[in-house]
Amino acid sequence: DATDDERRIDEINTSIYAFRRDLLAPALRHLSPNNAQGELYLTDVIAVLAGMGHKVGAIEAPAPETQGVNDRWQLALAERELRARTNRHWLLNGVTMIDPRQTFVDIGVSIGRDVTLFPGTMLQGRTVIGDGCEIGPDTRLVDSKVGDGSRVENTVGRHTEIGSACRVGPFAHLASGSVVADGVTTGAFYDSETGPST
């Protein structure tokens, strides 16, 4: 149904609309399938509302704001964009990331002041990192809490709590529900289910 002039437009309609509920139903009743496809087009509601004297408008958005996700490649691109925004937020708020491209922080994570995140760090879920911590490299914490001034390296932990001034790792495994008390050094190859490696 597009005209030649319409085909030359290099913008797209993302199909994201915000309507006043009391205006939408009457506008929908004015739609008709008078097109090559014989279908009702939601896009026609804009012209209907404008014809009824209502104010309508469009917002131009940057491409990353509106990119579609139809396959895993596009999902990876969208995740990269979101990760860059999240990392930028933390970098502007006093967190040091040695390599932001290799640092993964979920939206629900909370990070204190003067924290350093080394490459390969993944903080997921509702993880909370206290002030002055060093996390990583190659550390994954999910729904875990780390107290102030602790250093956690090459460690995996889920639903765990690490106290303040602790030294965990390298190569530590913290089982779900485990607690490392304040000031404890676990040593290398620590497994909270079996104790230190011998």
Stretches with model-predicted labels:
Residues 90-93:
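A eukaryote-biased feature capturing mid-to-C-terminal, repeat/solenoid-rich segments of large proteins
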Residues 96-198:
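Structural signal for interior beta-strand "rungs" in well-ordered beta-sheet cores
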